[in-house]
């Protein structure tokens, strides 16, 4: 059976597939150390509204822990629903919404020092995010071998660490190019067509 669910609902179902029963708060905690790095970590209110929807559809079941707190587990139908969604719908191409790149595009409208400060701040933010994700990755050690419960989450964490490293390299390379342009008197902040993109090279592509 197929259900017309938002992607967030499928994401929450997926977080319940690791063999444990979670409260809404615990599900929020799990989302904060997983989904926030590559999707969106939903607010508590959204989590509870989605859990109510999923329970009404029979995709999750509630279990009273004896203390009056509801815990949630995925049902067989819920697990099959996630499998169907993954096998019968395309993942789609990710839409990149990059505020730093957007502002860099318009760098010719401000002074180079402002743009450089923005890039330096971004490098600092990347370092902080990488530290957070590295902690998550480390917590998966010992349970991340092929066939173990957290093998695929560890692959996602490694992907995220590589992404942060790549973004850091790109930002630092951009700052170097701006410094070189300033030293030779050229204007690297805008491309020859006025788009602000500059001329890319094969080496500018992010590496996995």
Can you say where each PLM-predicted feature lies in the sequence?
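Alpha-helix N-cap/N′ positions at the starts of helices
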Residues: 7-8, 99, 152
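Amphipathic alpha-helical dimerization/coiled-coil segments
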Residues: 84-135
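Inter-helical turn/loop segments and adjacent helix faces that build the functional surface
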Residues: 113, 178-182
């Amino acid at each position: 059976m197929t259900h017309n669910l938002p992607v967030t609902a499928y994401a929450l179902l997926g977080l319940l597939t690791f063999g444990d029963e979670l409260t809404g708060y615990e599900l929020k905690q799990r989302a904060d150390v997983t989904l926030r790095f590559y999707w969106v970590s939903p607010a508590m209110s959204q989590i509870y509204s989605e859990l109510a929807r999923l329970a009404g559809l029979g995709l999750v079941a509630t279990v009273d822990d004896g203390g009056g707190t509801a815990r949630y587990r995925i049902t067989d139908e819920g697990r099959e629903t996630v499998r169907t969604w993954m096998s019968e719908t395309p993942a789609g191409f990710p839409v990149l919404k990059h505020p730093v790149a957007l502002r860099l595009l318009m760098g010719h409208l401000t002074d180079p020092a402002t743009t450089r400060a923005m890039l330096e701040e971004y490098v600092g933010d990347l370092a902080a995010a990488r530290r957070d994700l590295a902690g998550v990755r480390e917590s998966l050690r010992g349970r991340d071998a092929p066939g173990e419960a957290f093998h695929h989450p560890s692959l996602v964490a490694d992907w995220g660490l590589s992404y942060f490293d790549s973004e850091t390299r790109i930002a630092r390379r951009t700052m170097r190019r701006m410094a070189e342009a300033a030293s030779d008197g050229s204007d690297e902040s805008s491309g020859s067509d006025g788009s602000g993109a500059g001329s890319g090279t094969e080496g500018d592509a992010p590496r996995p």
